[in-house]
C-alpha cells in the first residue's frame, strides 16, 4: 500500500496520560524523535479520578520510575499539597509514600517538562488508525487524514478507547472527564487482530469546600518530617504549609438511600457491562457486598490550593444525580454540601495483556507497544511504570540494542508486568504488596539501589544524578563494612554502658553489625560505642543501613529464592515451539502455553493452572530437543 507521510518519527505515542508522558519522555531522552499525540492537550498528565500519587505498593513504583530516570516523582515533589508516609507502624516492606496533589498544577508542570524536552513533539490530534505492513508498524493515520511514519507506536489511551460515561440511566460516548472518546482506534485495534476486553471504573462526586462542615469530621494532617518521591529532591524544599484532608463516614441513612435505589443503579440494572475494579468498588457495590458493615470510611481530599473542589474518596458511584445528592447530604459534615461534579462510571476497551511480551510489545505486531489502562491496569502509578518501560523498549528496539525486562525481583514494575503478561487479568489490575513474593527486597527505601544502574546504562540517568548516587552507594557500602569490622567485647566498661542504655549485657564478642541486629538497638546506639562514620550520613542512608542489617536473615533467604528463579529465567523456550508435540502435559497446561507462549521456564512455571509436573515434562522435552539439535550439528561437520 502507498502512504503519503507528511512527517516521520522514530516513535509515536498515542495518549498523553501518565503512561504516555513517561513513554515519550524516556524515548526522546534516549535520542529518538518522538511524537506525543493527544485528543486534548489541556489534559496532559491529568488526574481524572483521585487527586493523589502513591500509596501502598504504588508509592514504591513512583520511586522505581524515578530511579530509572522517569518524571512522575519529580513532578509530584514540585506540586503536592500534602505528603504522608503510610504504614509507619508496620515493617519496612509495606511502608510507602502518598502525596495529595494539586492536580491542575501537576498537569501544568508536566506539560512544561514535555514542551521543553528535546526530540519530543506534542500535538493535539486524534489518531484513528495504526498503519501496519507485513506484521510491522509503519505509522499512523489521524482523523484529519494526515499520515505520519513511525518505526514504533505506543498506545497509551487510558479509558478513552470506546469510552462511555454512565450516570443512572444516562449513557453516552465519552473519554475521562467528559473528553472525546476514541472510537475508530478501538475498531482498528480489533481489525489488527488483537483480543479486546471491556472494563469499567468510576469516580465520586466532588463537593464545594466552603460548604463542608469540617468541625464534625476528623482532620488528617501531612507529615512534618521531610519525605520525597524523587531521589533528586532536597529536604530544604519540603513544604511545611500543607493542606489537610478530612475523614468522615457513611451511616445507616446513607446505606438506606443506596438500598432503596438499587433498582436505579447501573451496576445492578445491567447498564454497566464492563468489569469493575475489585479493590476500588463503587459505594453501591460495597453496601451490597459488605451488608454487615455499619459504616465505610470517606476521605475528603482537596484537589488543589486554588480550587473549591473536594474529592470524596470512597464514594465512587454511578447512581442517578438526584440519588447522589441525597447520599452526599446524608453524610456527617456534608449535610449542606454543594455538589460541584457528579460521580460517574466509565466503560472502556482494553487490550488483553496475555498478548504482550514483557517488553510491552505486542506478540502479533512488531513495533506496536501498549501501556497503562490500555493493558487493563488501574492507577496513575501503574500507568507510569508501564509507560517508562514501553518507551525504553521501543527506543532500544529501534536502536538495535538489547531489550530491558524487569524481573519480579527487580521491582514492583517487574511484578506488575509479569502478572499481566503471564497471568492476564479479568478485572482492572491494581498493585498490592501481597502480589510481590520478594517484597522485603522491593522496598521504598532502596529503589535507587535496585534500578539506578539500569537507568544509567540505558541513558536516562545524567552525570549529576549518577555522581550523587555513587556517593550514596559508597557511603552505604563503606559503613556496612565498618560495622562488620569493629568488635564489641564483653569487658566491664562496655557492658556497664550497654546496661546503662537498657540493653542486655554482652556474653561474647560481637561485631557492631551483630549488635545492631538486636531489635531494640538503633544505629545511633551503636555509634555511641564505635564513633561516627568518616562522612556524615543522612537519615535516609542510616534508615537503609538499619533495615538491611536488622532484616538480613530474611533478605538473605529472599535472595536465595531470587537466585533459583534466575536459573529458571535463563532457560529459554524457543519461539517456534509446537506445544502439541509435547506428550503427557495436562490439557489445561497445554491450552495456557498456547495462549501465553511463555518465553522462559520461569515464566511458564508462574502461569495459573500449570503444575510442577507440567514444568518437569517441558524441561525434559526441551533437553531432548537440544540433544537432537547438537547431534544434527555434529553430523553435519
Swiss-Prot record:
Cellular compartments per GO CC: cytosol
Cofactor(s) recorded in Swiss-Prot or TrEMBL: FAD
Gene: mnmG
Record-listed NAD(+) binding positions: 276-290
Subcellular location: Cytoplasm
Organism: Streptococcus pneumoniae serotype 4 (strain ATCC BAA-334 / TIGR4)
Main location: cytoplasm
Record's keyword terms, sorted: Cytoplasm, FAD, Flavoprotein, NAD, tRNA processing
Residue positions binding FAD: 15-20, 127, 182, 373
Protein name: tRNA uridine 5-carboxymethylaminomethyl modification enzyme MnmG
Record family assignment: Belongs to the MnmG family.
Gene Ontology molecular function terms on file: flavin adenine dinucleotide binding
Subunit structure, interactors included: Homodimer. Heterotetramer of two MnmE and two MnmG subunits.
Family annotation (InterPro entries): FAD/NAD-bd_sf (IPR036188), GIDA_C_N (IPR049312), MnmG (IPR004416), MnmG-rel (IPR002218), MnmG-rel_CS (IPR020595), MnmG_C (IPR026904), MnmG_C_subdom (IPR047001), MnmG_C_subdom_sf (IPR044920)
Amino acid at each position: 500500500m502507498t502512504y503519503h507521510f507528511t512527517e516521520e518519527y522514530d516513535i509515536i505515542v498515542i495518549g498523553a496520560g501518565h503512561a504516555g508522558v513517561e513513554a515519550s519522555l524516556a524515548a526522546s531522552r534516549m535520542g529518538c524523535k518522538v511524537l506525543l499525540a493527544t485528543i486534548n492537550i489541556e489534559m496532559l498528565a491529568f488526574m481524572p479520578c483521585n487527586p493523589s500519587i502513591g500509596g501502598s505498593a504504588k508509592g514504591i513504583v513512583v520511586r522505581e520510575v524515578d530511579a530509572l530516570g522517569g518524571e512522575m516523582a519529580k513532578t509530584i515533589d514540585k506540586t503536592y499539597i500534602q505528603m504522608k508516609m503510610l504504614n509507619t507502624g508496620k515493617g519496612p516492606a509495606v511502608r510507602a509514600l502518598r502525596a495529595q496533589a494539586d492536580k491542575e498544577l501537576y498537569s501544568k508542570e508536566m506539560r512544561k517538562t514535555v514542551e521543553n524536552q528535546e526530540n519530543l513533539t506534542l500535538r493535539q490530534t486524534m489518531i484513528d488508525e495504526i498503519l501496519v505492513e507485513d506484521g510491522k508498524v509503519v505509522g499512523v493515520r489521524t482523523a484529519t487524514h494526515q499520515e505520519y511514519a513511525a518505526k514504533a507506536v505506543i498506545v497509551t489511551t487510558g479509558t478513552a478507547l470506546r469510552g462511555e460515561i454512565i450516570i443512572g440511566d444516562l449513557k453516552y460516548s465519552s473519554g475521562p472527564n467528559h473528553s472525546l472518546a476514541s472510537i475508530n482506534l478501538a475498531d482498528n485495534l480489533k481489525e489488527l487482530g488483537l483480543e479486546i476486553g471491556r472494563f469499567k471504573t468510576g469516580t465520586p462526586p466532588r463537593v464545594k469546600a466552603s460548604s463542608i462542615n469540617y468541625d464534625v469530621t476528623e482532620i488528617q494532617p501531612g507529615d512534618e518530617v521531610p519525605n520525597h518521591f524523587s531521589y533528586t529532591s532536597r529536604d530544604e524544599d519540603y513544604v511545611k504549609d500543607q493542606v489537610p484532608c478530612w475523614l468522615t463516614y457513611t451511616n445507616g441513612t446513607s446505606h438506606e438511600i443506596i438500598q432503596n435505589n438499587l433498582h436505579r443503579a447501573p451496576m445492578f440494572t445491567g447498564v454497566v457491562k464492563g468489569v469493575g475494579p475489585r479493590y476500588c468498588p463503587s459505594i453501591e457495590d460495597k453496601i451490597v457486598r459488605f451488608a454487615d458493615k455499619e459504616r465505610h470510611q470517606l476521605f475528603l481530599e482537596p484537589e488543589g490550593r486554588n480550587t473549591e473542589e473536594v474529592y470524596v474518596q470512597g464514594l465512587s458511584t454511578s447512581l442517578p444525580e438526584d440519588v447522589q445528592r441525597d447520599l452526599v447530604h446524608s453524610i456527617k459534615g456534608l449535610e449542606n454540601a454543594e455538589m460541584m461534579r457528579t460521580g460517574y462510571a466509565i466503560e472502556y476497551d482494553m487490550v488483553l495483556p496475555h498478548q504482550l511480551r514483557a517488553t510491552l510489545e505486542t506478540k502479533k505486531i512488531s513495533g506496536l507497544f501498549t501501556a497503562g489502562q490500555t493493558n487493563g491496569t488501574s492507577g496513575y502509578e501503574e500507568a507510569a511504570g508501564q509507560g517508562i518501560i514501553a518507551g525504553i523498549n521501543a527506543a532500544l528496539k529501534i536502536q538495535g540494542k538489547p531489550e530491558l525486562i524487569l524481573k519480579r525481583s527487580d521491582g514492583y514494575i517487574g511484578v506488575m508486568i509479569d502478572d499481566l503478561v503471564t497471568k492476564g487479568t479479568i478485572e482492572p489490575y491494581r498493585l498490592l504488596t501481597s502480589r510481590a513474593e520478594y517484597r522485603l527486597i522491593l522496598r521504598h527505601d532502596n529503589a535507587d539501589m535496585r534500578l539506578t544502574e539500569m537507568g544509567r546504562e540505558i541513558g536516562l540517568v545524567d552525570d549529576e544524578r549518577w555522581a550523587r548516587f555513587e556517593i550514596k552507594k559508597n557511603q552505604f557500602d563503606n559503613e556496612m563494612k565498618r560495622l562488620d569490622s569493629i568488635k564489641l567485647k564483653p569487658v566491664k566498661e562496655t557492658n556497664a554502658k550497654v546496661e546503662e542504655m537498657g540493653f542486655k549485657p554482652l556474653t561474647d564478642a560481637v561485631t557492631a553489625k551483630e549488635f545492631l541486629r538486636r531489635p531494640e538497638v538503633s544505629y545511633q546506639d551503636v555509634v555511641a560505642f564505635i564513633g561516627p562514620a568518616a562522612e556524615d550520613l543522612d537519615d535516609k542512608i542510616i534508615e537503609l543501613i538499619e533495615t538491611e542489617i536488622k532484616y538480613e536473615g530474611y533478605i538473605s533467604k529472599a535472595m536465595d529464592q531470587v537466585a533459583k528463579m534466575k536459573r529458571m529465567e535463563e532457560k529459554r523456550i524457543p519461539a517456534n515451539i509446537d506445544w502439541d508435540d509435547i506428550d503427557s502435559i495436562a490439557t489445561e497446561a497445554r491450552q495456557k502455553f498456547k495462549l501465553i507462549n511463555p518465553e522462559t521456564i520461569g515464566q511458564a512455571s508462574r502461569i495459573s493452572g500449570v503444575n510442577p509436573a507440567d514444568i518437569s515434562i517441558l524441561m525434559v522435552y526441551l533437553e531432548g530437543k537440544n540433544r537432537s539439535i547438537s547431534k544434527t550439528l555434529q553430523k553435519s561437520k
